[in-house]
C-alpha cells in the first residue's frame, strides 16, 4: 500500500479515535507520587511486588529512583549512571539489574540499594531488555551508541540471572533498536528494529536470528509485545503514529490503528483483552495512554485516549496489583510525578 493510502487510513482512524473520549475510562487516576528534584525524561520501570517498591530509571537525571508505593514517597535516588535505561528485578535474590548508556549493566541489592557488580557488554550502549522466566535468562539490547546504520553489527546480550554473568550474544544487523518481545509458549524473541524498519525474529534455543519481517507501511517500530493466545504481535510505531497488529506466525499484517505521538511503552492485558500504549516522548506538548480492546484476533477498537502530562511515555502494567503506572517529566515548574492508575473492568 502506498504512503498516500496509509495516510488516508490514518486520517479516517483519527476521526473515530478522538470521538471516544466521553466513554467510561478503563483507567482511573487514584494518586500521584511527587518526585521532587528529578529532571528530564524517564525510560523504564521494574517492580518488587512483595515489598511494593518501584525502581524507575530517570535517564536524564542520571539516577534510578526507589519509590515506596505503600508510603507514596520516593525513598532514594541511586546515582553512578551515565544514563540509566532499563531495569529488571529478581525476587529470588532480592536484587535488580540496570542497563547503562556506556554499555554496562549494574547489579544492586534491593534492601541496601548498594552496588554489587558491574559488567561490561560487547558494545558501548545497553538499552531495553526482556526476561525469559522458563530459563531465567535475560536478553539485553546491546548496540553501538548513536548509530542509525541498518548494517551496523548489534547484539542481544544473554545474562544468566542466577549469577548475573554475561554468557553470550545473539548477533543481528541494525544500530537503532528499542525493545524486544518474548514468545511465552515458544522459543522466539521479536526485535523492534528501527534502523531496518522490520521485526527481527530470534530463536532463543539456537541463539540466532532466523527471520525478519519488513514493515509494509511507513513508520519506525519502537515498542513491541505479544498476545500468545491469539498469536498476535502488537507494535507501536512513530512517524506516523500507529499501532500495528501482526500475525506472529507469519509476520502478515492484520490491522493498524492510530495512536498518540511519541509512543515508547506497550503492554498487553490478557485478562481484559486490552493493549495500553503510553506516548509523549521528548518535546510532545502532551502525553497520553491509548487503550485498545481486542474484539477477536483480527479485530480491535480504540476505547480511550487518556491525557497524562507532558513527556509521559514511560509506563508499567502490573495486573497483580490492578495498577498501571505512568512517569511524568518535570515541566514548566511542576515537579515530576509517578501517576498511579486503577485498572477498571
Give the residues covered by each predicted segment:
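Positively charged n-region of N-terminal signal peptides that target proteins for export
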Residues: 1-5
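Bacterial N-terminal signal peptides
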Residues: 6-15
Amino acid at each position: 500500500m502506498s504512503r498516500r493510502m496509509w495516510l488516508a487510513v490514518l486520517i479516517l482512524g483519527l476521526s473515530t479515535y478522538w470521538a471516544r473520549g466521553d466513554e467510561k475510562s478503563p483507567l482511573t487516576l487514584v494518586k500521584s507520587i511527587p518526585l521532587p528534584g528529578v529532571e528530564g525524561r524517564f525510560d523504564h520501570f521494574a517492580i518488587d511486588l512483595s515489598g511494593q517498591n518501584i525502581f524507575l530509571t530517570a535517564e536524564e537525571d542520571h539516577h534510578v529512583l526507589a519509590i515506596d508505593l505503600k508510603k507514596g514517597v520516593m525513598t532514594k535516588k541511586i546515582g553512578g549512571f551515565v544514563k540509566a535505561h532499563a531495569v529488571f528485578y529478581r525476587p529470588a535474590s532480592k536484587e535488580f539489574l540496570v542497563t547503562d548508556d556506556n554499555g554496562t549493566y549494574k547489579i544492586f541489592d534491593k534492601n541496601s540499594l548498594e552496588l554489587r557488580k558491574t559488567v561490561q557488554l560487547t558494545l558501548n550502549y545497553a538499552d531495553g531488555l526482556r526476561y525469559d522466566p522458563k530459563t531465567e535468562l535475560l536478553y539485553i539490547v546491546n548496540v553501538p551508541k548513536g548509530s542509525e546504520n541498518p548494517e551496523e553489527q548489534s547484539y542481544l546480550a544473554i545474562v544468566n540471572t542466577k549469577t548475573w554473568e554475561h554468557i553470550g550474544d545473539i548477533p543481528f544487523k541494525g544500530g537503532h533498536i528499542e525493545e524486544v518481545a518474548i514468545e511465552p509458549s515458544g522459543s522466539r524473541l521479536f526485535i523492534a528494529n528501527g534502523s531496518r524498519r522490520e521485526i527481527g525474529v530470534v530463536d532463543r534455543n539456537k541463539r540466532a536470528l532466523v527471520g525478519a519481517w519488513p514493515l509494509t507501511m511507513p513508520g519506525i517500530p519502537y515498542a513491541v509485545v505479544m498476545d500468545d493466545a491469539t498469536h498476535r504481535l502488537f507494535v507501536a510505531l512513530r512517524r506516523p503514529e500507529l499501532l500495528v497488529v501482526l500475525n506472529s506466525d507469519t509476520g502478515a499484517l492484520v490491522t493498524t490503528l492510530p495512536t498518540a505521538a511519541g509512543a515508547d511503552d506497550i503492554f498487553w492485558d490478557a485478562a481484559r483483552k486490552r493493549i495500553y500504549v503510553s506516548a509523549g516522548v521528548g518535546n510532545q506538548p502532551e502525553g497520553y495512554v491509548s487503550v485498545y480492546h481486542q474484539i477477536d484476533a483480527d479485530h480491535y477498537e480504540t476505547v480511550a485516549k487518556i491525557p497524562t502530562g507532558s513527556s509521559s511515555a514511560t509506563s508499567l502494567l502490573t495486573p497483580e496489583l490492578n495498577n498501571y503506572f505512568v512517569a511524568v517529566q518535570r515541566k514548566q515548574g511542576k515537579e515530576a510525578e509517578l501517576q498511579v492508575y486503577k485498572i477498571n473492568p
